[in-house]
A protein has these predicted regions:
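Structured, active/binding-site neighborhoods that engage oxygen-rich ligands
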Residues: 1-245
């Protein structure tokens, strides 16, 4: 992340591997949605937003060095704070659970927006969250890449390839300069792992690009069992809970 690394050739696992802020916040969103669903209150936005803030702070402060942006970390540390207008890609990196708790595309898009606005209440963040969650949902329902590209193309210009932008791309943590690249990392891939490698090879905010590519790639390609076995070695308790959900 942020090293300017520009290659698909790297060991997928190493002794330096650790869970990222992306994964932890995805678990927090899943916890909030699951609790609301169990209580029959998933349709009550204000209640769900309260749960989201609670679980994000509870899990986030358990691992304060996971790699959060400075503004989001400050938000985590001050429970009295509401959303702060962020257009950062944190709204997209954590949104995957919406694709599993929404029953229709419209519900998924709404849950995506709810998950974003607890901290990232900006139109760019809403757009990003809906695009990623919607793609993941449609992939779960059997959409092909043409269909997924057409759907995501409602939100972003995707007329580029990973190979075509790799050398010139200079990423940042804004939604508009990272979410399209994460989606195209999936669209240009021929496997789940290839999507991750595409994302990392672009440099920039590589863990978030990979979180986006992986959120769509898992329901589309599936994850090879051997890769799961290796990844499990790095799981924290928060991730283990959702392994077979």
């Amino acid at each position: 992340e942020w090293t300017g690394f520009k290659s698909k050739e790297f060991p997928l696992f190493s002794a330096k591997c650790r869970v990222t802020d992306d994964s932890l916040m995805t678990c927090a969103v899943a916890e909030a949605f699951a609790k609301a669903q169990q209580e029959g209150r998933l349709g009550e936005d204000a209640y769900v937003e309260g749960l989201l803030a609670h679980f994000m702070r509870t899990i986030g402060l358990r691992y304060p060095d996971a790699g959060y942006g400075s503004k989001f970390l400050y938000w985590l540390q001050h429970k009295e704070l509401g959303p702060y207008g962020s257009f950062g890609n944190g709204a997209a990196m954590r949104v995957a659970p919406a694709a599993y708790f929404g029953r229709t595309l419209e519900e998924v898009e709404h849950l995506a927006m709810v998950s974003a606005r607890v901290s990232h209440n900006h139109p760019s963040a809403y757009k990003a969250a809906k695009a990623v969650a919607g793609c993941a949902f449609l992939a779960r329902k059997g959409a092909d890449k043409d269909g997924l590209g057409a759907y995501a193309g409602r939100y972003y210009n995707l007329h580029f390839t990973v190979e075509g932008i790799r050398d010139s791309y200079r990423g940042d943590s804004s939604c508009d300069n990272s979410v399209p690249q994460g989606i195209v990392s999936f669209l240009d891939a021929d496997s789940f792992e290839d999507g991750l490698r595409n994302a990392v090879s672009l440099g920039g905010d590589s863990d978030t690009l990979a979180a986006i590519a992986g959120a769509i790639g898992e329901p589309f390609f599936g994850i090879p069992p051997l890769l799961v076995v290796e990844a499990r070695k790095y799981y924290l308790p928060e991730l283990k809970k959702w392994e077979n959900a």
